[in-house]
Swiss-Prot record:
Record flagged with keyword Zinc: yes
Functional pathway: Glycolipid biosynthesis; lipid IV(A) biosynthesis; lipid IV(A) from (3R)-3-hydroxytetradecanoyl-[acyl-carrier-protein] and UDP-N-acetyl-alpha-D-glucosamine: step 2/6
Binding site for Zn(2+): 78, 237, 241
Gene Ontology, cellular component aspect: membrane
Molecular function terms from GO: metal ion binding; UDP-3-O-acyl-N-acetylglucosamine deacetylase activity
Chemical reaction(s) catalysed: a UDP-3-O-[(3R)-3-hydroxyacyl]-N-acetyl-alpha-D-glucosamine + H2O = a UDP-3-O-[(3R)-3-hydroxyacyl]-alpha-D-glucosamine + acetate
Documented EC number(s): 3.5.1.108
Family from the record: Belongs to the LpxC family.
Keyword GTP-binding included in the entry's annotation: no
Keyword tags: Hydrolase, Lipid A biosynthesis, Lipid biosynthesis, Lipid metabolism, Metal-binding, Zinc
Record's protein name: UDP-3-O-acyl-N-acetylglucosamine deacetylase
Amino acid sequence: MIRQRTLKSIVKATGVGLHGGRKVQLVLRPAAPDTGVVFHRVDLDPPCDLPADPYSVCDTRMCSGLERNGAKVGTVEHLMSAVAGLGVDNLHVDVDAPELPILDGSAGPFVFLLQSAGIEEQKAPKRFLRVKKAVEYREDDKWVRLEPHDGFRLTFSIVFNHPAIDKTSTSVTVDFAEHSYVRDVARARTFGFMQDVDSMRAHGLALGGSLDNAIVMDEYRVLNSDGLRYVDEFVKHKVLDAIGDLYLCGHPLLAAYSAHKAGHALNNQILRVLLEDRSAWEIATFEQPGMTPAAVSHQFELAPAT
């Protein structure tokens, strides 16, 4: 049986919020089976609970943000991506600010935190969301699609018309029947352009952004002295974001995801399109030996409980 997972112990981190630029304290705690991922704004009186839920997504400008009863928590996608990549189902996330810390701009530090806490299996079957028929969402030349697949595969293509990006791979397929989240995806950083900084900061965005937590480009080149972590780091970060955005549905997907020029908004819309068509999905568990698709077994063998 493929079981649900949570943390063995509590782990803490401190960092800076990407958009607000203020210090943020983060605490990750174990949670009971079938809890899901729940964010807690512990700086509010009374504290506010914000469960991971695609219908709570309120802000998709440059990140995925959740809102409930007027309380918000932003930039959840990198942590959600790491949680999905390591197969963690149940987690309490305490945060004392309106956004999570950006850390190094990838999911790598969150993977380290989760692995440092230890991951343990629970006495409940993992509940997958299996896509039964194709669904699609389009806006102009941007689109995203989910199709039936016996595993989890993501294909993404980007168009930026920038020399630093164009000389890298601008399309990628990550199939977890073959690839490792930790090795192949987790370290891809968010990216931005110097020409956009003044405009973003005028709108209260990217106040905490720096070369320490993003790939930054001028008109021609990458400004980070250490260069890129992957030859296709730009499009790989889009895959990283998509994994986190999709995990807001509350379950690991059995699906093939494909997207062109998509972002947080389209990822949220495709989840809503899927969930609102009850004939397009079902909940699946693998409780008997031999029932588990090989792709699923491989994915969680590469991210074992510790």
